[in-house]
A protein has these predicted regions:
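Gly/Pro- and small hydrophobic-enriched strand-loop and loop-to-helix capping segments
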Residues: 180-186, 202-203
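Terminal amphipathic alpha-helical/low-complexity segments used for targeting or macromolecular assembly
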Residues: 1-76, 194-198
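Extracytoplasmic/periplasmic beta-strand context in beta-sandwich domains
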Residues: 165, 186-187
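Flexible, glycine/small-residue-enriched loop-and-beta-strand segment within the central core
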Residues: 83-93, 98-166, 192-203
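Short-chain dehydrogenase/reductase
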Residues: 154, 172, 188-190
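C-terminal/domain-terminus segments
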Residues: 167-182
Length: 203
């Protein structure tokens, strides 16, 4: 668990808001029940609710709302409904990004995805971490680790990607895998825990 923060100034409300946000996205321990974070969570949930209620044929409106929600996306970003995330602004996706139904991202830390990536249905990306000690866990103190995915990656259906993982470029992750550690470039990886089973031949 990251070191605790004891230097917050209780007399500065706006400073506390900025500080708890910076603590969260930078991997330091933070208070998950801080009012500022809860306010941002609920605002994002309202926007996600709006997105998921749009008709599938309303492609322009869907894309416009995604570009408002996400930290970075493009006119060719496509995410099937329903889609779920915590903050949205910590998610950055590259060109020609596609995600299928029930894509879930807990983006307490940055989630960065490269170009030409395909996400299968029921894929989950987690950045939030909790203590295994029940007393510490019940304090609602958390920390987060970023997830990074390279270019030309295919994530199969029902894959779970855990906090702090980096997946290289030109990678296929087999359906149902649980990715608990980094995956190198140019390979096929499957299983729980996810392991490399084949490297692609270099031309």
């Amino acid at each position: 668990m990251p070191a605790k923060n004891h230097d917050m100034d209780p007399n500065s409300h706006m400073d506390n808001d900025s500080r708890v946000w910076e603590e969260m996205i930078s991997g330091r321990e933070y208070d998950a029940t801080h009012p500022y974070l809860l306010e941002k969570l609920n605002a994002t949930k309202d926007r996600i609710w709006e997105y998921n209620k749009l008709r599938p044929s309303m492609l322009k409106e869907r894309n416009e709302l995604l570009r408002e929600l996400l930290g970075q996306s493009d006119e060719d970003t496509f995410i099937n409904q329903p889609f779920y995330c915590d903050y949205g602004c910590n998610i950055c996706v590259g060109r020609r990004f596609f995600a299928n139904f029930n894509f879930t991202v807990l983006d307490e830390a940055p989630v960065t995805v490269g170009n030409d990536c395909f996400i299968g249905p029921n894929v989950s990306i987690y950045t939030a971490c909790h203590s295994t000690d029940p007393v510490e866990r019940n304090s609602r103190r958390e920390w987060a680790k970023p997830v990074t995915i390279g270019d030309n990656v295919w994530i199969g259906g029902s894959v779970t990607i855990l906090p702090g993982v980096t997946i290289g470029s030109n990678v296929t992750i087999g359906a149902g895998s649980v990715v608990v550690k980094d995956i190198p470039d140019g390979c096929v990886a499957v299983g729980n825990p996810c392991r490399v089973v084949k490297f692609l031949e270099k031309e």
